[in-house]
C-alpha cells in the first residue's frame, strides 16, 4: 500500500489540512494519507502548542466528520474518511520527533508499505536543517505542496521529489 505521511502539529487541525489530504487522495497514487500528529517539532516553540492528546483528539474528530458512506456500486471503494488516518505513531517514539526517525520506524513496523513524505514548500528553505535530511532525500518520495506567501525556492536533489502545483493551499 502507498501511504502519504502528512506530519504536523495540527495546532489546531483546520480545513486546509483536511482539504490537502483529500486532494492528495483524489489526485495521486496514494492509497491512504496518515495525519502524523507530532508531539513536538524540534524547529518550533513547543510552549505554544495545545496538549498533544487534545490535538490528536481534535484531528480524529475532524476526520470522523468527513462523509463515510459511498453510493452503492458493484465495486465499492473506500471513502476519504476511510483513507485519511489520524496517527499517534510519533507519540511512542523518542523525543523530540525527527522525521527521518519516524520514517525509519514506520518502515520497520510496516515493511509492506511504501511511504511518501508530504511537506509544505515553506519547509524546503529549511530542509537542510532537518536531522538526517539526506537520508530522507535518498530513501523516500516527497510530495511538496504549495504554501501561500512562500518565496521561490530551489529543490534539493533527491530520489523522487514531486511538486503538487495544483494542490489547494
Report the location of each language-model feature.
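Nucleotidyltransferase catalytic core that binds NTPs
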Residues: 1-169
Amino acid at each position: 500500500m502507498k501511504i502519504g505521511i502528512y506530519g504536523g502539529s495540527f495546532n489546531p487541525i483546520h480545513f486546509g489540512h483536511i482539504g490537502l489530504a483529500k486532494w492528495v487522495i483524489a489526485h495521486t497514487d496514494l492509497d491512504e494519507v496518515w495525519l502524523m500528529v507530532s508531539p513536538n517539532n524540534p524547529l518550533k516553540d513547543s510552549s505554544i502548542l495545545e496538549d498533544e492528546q487534545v490535538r490528536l483528539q481534535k484531528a480524529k474528530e475532524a476526520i470522523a466528520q468527513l462523509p463515510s458512506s459511498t453510493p452503492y456500486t458493484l465495486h465499492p471503494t473506500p471513502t476519504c474518511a476511510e483513507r485519511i488516518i489520524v496517527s499517534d505513531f510519533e507519540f511512542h517514539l523518542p523525543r523530540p520527533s525527527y522525521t527521518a526517525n519516524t520514517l525509519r520506524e514506520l518502515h520497520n513496523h510496516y515493511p509492506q508499505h511504501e511511504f511518501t513524505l508530504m511537506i509544505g514548500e515553506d519547509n524546503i528553505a529549511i530542509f537542510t536543517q532537518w536531522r538526517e535530511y539526506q537520508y530522507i532525500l535518498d530513501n523516500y518520495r516527497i510530495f511538496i505542496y504549495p504554501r501561500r506567501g512562500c518565496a521561490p525556492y530551489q529543490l534539493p536533489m533527491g530520489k523522487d521529489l514531486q511538486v503538487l502545483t495544483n494542490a489547494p493551499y
